[in-house]
Amino acid sequence: MVKWLYQLFIELTNHAWTSKCLASFTRSKWSRLFISSYAKVYKINKEEMEKKLHEYETLQQLFVRTLKKGLRPIDTHPDSVVSPVDAVIEDVGIITDQKEIIVKGKTYSIREMLGDDQIAEKYLHGTFIILYLSPSHYHRIHSPICGEVVKQWELGGKSYPVNRLGLKYGKAPLSKNYRRITELYTNGMYTAIVKVGAMFVNSIELTHEHDHVKKGEEIGYFSFGSTVVLLFEKDVFTLDEQIVPPFEVKMGQRIGFLAQKKKSQ
């Protein structure tokens, strides 16, 4: 019953015009009146922001704010994988024989998430990591590894919330929400970065246009709280032993290691 009511509420309120109205408002000069209260409610760390709070002219500018230089050092170990975002690692697990992952008791299809069965096949029995960004988090997305950009594509339409309620009661938000996907190739290994849009504000902007990315390099940003899903192939990723979900991480912080060479299957 709770699940049905939750989904009904989302369906009644989550329409294209709702998203457009909200996006338009957050970019308007009137939204500036809400910046101070927004920062207070979500406990935004003003000491980290590149600008003073009063210098942001719209809520949108605050959402996509940059940070002071040097506040997010990138782990320097050559084989490390770093967090692409400031977030909470909500779940880590293994992709099943059916190309599925289980998050908060809900099953998600990797094939549906990626929109391509051949691409999904690469990640069979690999590792997935779910990173949730709240509205208070720094919203810019960075590359977790160095690599060649193989492909970038987008899927999905309207979006359910991607917080804990959304993951539990929503209609498979990780595989149905609007999402933009980047696949990287490093030393014979593939990694997928799935950027999942949040309810009402589907905006995911890409800021990297080159064929190669460095670890920690900015690749895009969300316009509101959202989620990143990382997918690794079988036997190529080892989780850092200190990470036990739910676990708060900062962008650039080491979350694990990539194998130096992919094992032969």
From Swiss-Prot:
It is an enzyme of class 4 (lyase). Keywords: Cell membrane, Decarboxylase, Lipid biosynthesis, Lipid metabolism, Lyase, Membrane, Phospholipid biosynthesis, Phospholipid metabolism, Pyruvate, Zymogen. Its cofactor is pyruvate. It holds the Pfam family PS_Dcarbxylase. Pathway: Phospholipid metabolism; phosphatidylethanolamine biosynthesis; phosphatidylethanolamine from CDP-diacylglycerol: step 2/2. Its EC number is 4.1.1.65. Catalyzes the formation of phosphatidylethanolamine (PtdEtn) from phosphatidylserine (PtdSer). HAMAP family: PS_decarb_PSD_B_type1. Belongs to the phosphatidylserine decarboxylase family. PSD-B subfamily. Prokaryotic type I sub-subfamily. Heterodimer of a large membrane-associated beta subunit and a small pyruvoyl-containing alpha subunit. This is Phosphatidylserine decarboxylase proenzyme. The gene is psd.
